[in-house]
């Protein structure tokens, strides 16, 4: 499966990013490049909406950590919402549920 990256600005003036599909070793660079580009362009807090995220592997989690660090350097925030139970479990097992603000 492939990855589609949708994004919009929310009413809270946050950049909401919706990865659609799978984030793995093959699609992680695309996600990283797009989000880093958006951070440079918009310089806003980010919400990752996992509603349509079907799968994420360790390379995808690494990309999210890179995004987290980049936002921290800019005094910006990231939150993750609407994760499916199997994906939340991966965040829980790796301890990233304590790093990221995860809601829903």
Task: Describe the residue ranges of each PLM region.
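STAS-typified acidic loop motif
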Residues: 7-33
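Amphipathic alpha-helical interaction surfaces in cytosolic regulatory modules
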Residues: 25-99
């Amino acid at each position: 499966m492939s990855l589609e990256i949708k994004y919009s600005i929310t009413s809270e003036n946050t950049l909401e990013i919706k990865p659609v599909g799978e984030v793995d070793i093959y699609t992680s660079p695309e996600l990283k490049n797009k989000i880093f580009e958006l951070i440079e362009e918009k310089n806003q807090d980010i919400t990752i909406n996992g509603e349509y995220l079907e799968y994420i592997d360790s390379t995808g989690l690494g990309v999210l950590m890179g995004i987290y660090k980049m936002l921290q350097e800019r005094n910006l925030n990231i939150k993750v919402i609407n994760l499916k139970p199997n994906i939340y479990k991966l965040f829980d097992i790796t301890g990233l549920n304590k790093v990221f603000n995860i809601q829903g």
